[in-house]
A protein has these predicted regions:
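Structural boundary micro-motifs
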Residues: 1-160
Length: 160
């Protein structure tokens, strides 16, 4: 089999990366994942870790260690432990999506867009005074977060 080498621009590699599968693999042979993600918001936990480089690697390693060291004395069952780790991931991801914004729950004029769950369904709602863990500065950001991390939100369960 003959091997050939191609040149690929960063913009082209970013488009390939977004397509996933083998295209993503091709993009990753030419550029680091951190370069391909750039400043955009992560769509997965792994992208969050890649975006944050060495710090992300340390966070990922710490959470993996937590998974392995959880025992019956810490949580009543493994599902509870997974829910707590999911919430820790959501906390870090949420702060990335907020980009420095923090909700002022005393401000009765400015609405906050929150992700909540009722009867097993997750959705975005607008609140003014009711505090919520997954609160965002605008509806678009809240919906994007919900789309990208619905499974993780469901895994965190009633901790949200």
């Amino acid at each position: 089999m003959e091997t050939r080498y191609i040149e690929i621009s960063l913009d082209t590699a970013k488009r390939l990366y977004e397509q996933g599968g083998e295209f993503r693999d091709i993009a990753l042979t030419a550029f680091k994942e951190q370069e391909l993600i750039g400043d955009r918001l992560p769509k997965t936990w792994d992208e969050y870790c890649a975006k944050h480089g060495e710090v992300g690697d340390r966070i990922k390693a710490s959470l993996n260690t937590a998974y392995m060291t959880i025992n019956k004395y810490t949580f009543s069952d493994y599902k509870q432990a997974q829910a707590h780790i999911a919430k820790m991931k959501l906390h870090l991801l949420r702060d990335d999506y907020r980009n420095g914004w923090k909700p002022d729950w005393k401000d009765g004029k400015l609405g906050k867009y929150v992700i909540e769950s009722s009867e097993g369904e997750c959705y975005v709602a607008k609140y003014i005074h009711i505090s919520s863990f997954l609160a965002f500065q605008d509806e678009k950001t809240a919906n994007e977060f919900l789309t990208n991390f619905r499974e993780l939100i469901e895994e965190a369960g009633d901790l949200i």
